[in-house]
Regions:
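N-terminal glycine-rich cofactor-binding segment
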Residues: 3-21, 38-67, 84-87, 107-119
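NAD(P)H dinucleotide-binding glycine-rich loop of Rossmann-like/cofactor-binding domains
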Residues: 93-172
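Mid-domain Rossmann-like dinucleotide-binding core that forms the NAD(H)/NADP(H) cofactor-binding site
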Residues: 140-219
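Glycine-rich cofactor phosphate-binding loops and adjacent beta1-alpha1 units
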Residues: 161, 204-276
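C-terminal hydrophobic helical "lid"/dimerization subdomain
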Residues: 285-350
Length: 350
């Protein structure tokens, strides 16, 4: 079978790999779709701590169960051949203080599928433990459902935010994560949601998913301060613009991933005087099952967010397009033989 392989830092190839064989309590999944995100570029560029090469990328994955290992059809996580599924890519040691105190996402032995040591889903078929595999309803679009993994990250982002009913929320970045955080805001009790992006084309997507207040600069908005400000860009310029816009007693969240060696300037005195909270959020923590439930009950509008699908052979093209900030969510569909533009193409969703 065919797979994308990050052979070493900066080296990408498409290669033949052996067919996967499931171990105990594992299944083989035929990949339907796998989303491309910034983590994939960080991994290829050697910027993600602990990555072991060669590695098959791909951690935002859905597919169909095609084979069962011993015991995979037993217990509360039992699966069957033919099930459509979404896959939680995270695994942890389960033994360290962080794991034992409920902070598994911060485990120093965290192993993200397609990120650290375990091969990901940018291949025609892959294995996963049943504990990480979540069954989808038969009527759930298995391609759009590849947004469930980033949705699980967004739900955890809201979990760690101190908030009140009727807060006013400002989100920087109208990419995938910004759009998900903004769409969840009303369900988290927000009275209003404002989204900022320097790219007007991305604000068109924000309008399509229902975000009313959209600007290329926060200075153009109809408010000067917000209770909650969330940066989904990792841009130092956005962070430095956003922190002063937090209302007294409010909270600023670092959701986007800034470069590891980057620093931002802010006023410690203002944080002290106005009791501004600054919080981070990392990956998924007990939120994947909730993401499945929220996706399947229509919490987000997925269709406008996915613009292109690519074959395995066009993975490098997809990465170039992602780095250039073109399109919306880009997907690789390893078992399709044509790369396609999905938006504005009736009948082309699959």
């Amino acid at each position: 079978m065919r797979a994308v392989v990050f052979a070493a830092v900066g080296e990408l190839t498409v290669a033949e790999r052996p067919e996967p064989v499931p171990g105990p309590r594992e299944v083989v999944i035929e990949t339907a779709a796998v989303g491309i995100c910034g983590t994939d570029t960080h991994v290829l560029d050697g910027e993600f701590e602990g990555t072991v090469f060669p590695l098959v990328p791909g951690h935002e994955a859905t597919g169909t169960v095609v084979a069962l290992g011993p015991g995979a059809d037993e217990g509360p996580s039992a699966l069957a051949v033919g099930d459509h599924v979404a896959v939680n890519p995270s695994s942890t040691c389960g033994e360290c203080d962080l794991c034992l105190t409920g902070r598994q996402n911060l485990c120093r032995a965290w192993n993200g599928m397609g990120v650290v040591r375990a091969d990901g889903a940018a291949q025609q078929r892959f294995t996963a433990p049943v504990a990480n595999v979540f069954k989808l309803r038969p009527d759930t679009d298995v391609f759009e459902a590849a947004l469930i993994e980033p949705l699980a990250c967004a739900i955890h982002g809201w979990d760690v935010l101190p908030r009140r009913m009727a807060d006013h929320v400002l989100v920087y970045g109208s990419g995938t994560m910004g759009l998900l955080m903004a769409q969840l805001a009303p369900r988290a009790g927000a009275a209003s949601v404002t989204i900022i992006d320097v790219n007007p084309d991305r604000l068109v997507t924000a309008a399509q998913v229902g975000i009313e207040h959209r600007y290329t600069s926060a200075g153009d908005a109809d408010r000067a301060e917000w209770d909650v400000v969330i940066d989904c860009t990792g841009s130092i310029a956005a962070i430095e613009d956003g922190l002063p816009r937090v209302m007294a007693g409010g909270v600023f969240q670092h959701f986007g991933v800034a470069p590891a060696d980057a620093t931002a300037r802010y006023s410690p005195f203002r944080v002290y005087r106005d009791e501004v909270s600054v919080v981070g959020t990392m990956a998924v923590l007990n939120s994947f099952g909730r993401a499945v439930a929220m996706f399947e009950t229509g919490a987000i509008k997925a269709q406008p967010m996915i613009s292109h699908s690519f074959t395995l052979e066009d993975y490098a093209q997809a990465l170039r397009m992602f780095r250039a900030g073109q399109g919306r969510k880009l997907q690789v569909r390893p078992n399709q033989d044509t790369s396609r533009t999905l938006l504005g193409q009736p009948g082309q969703r699959r």
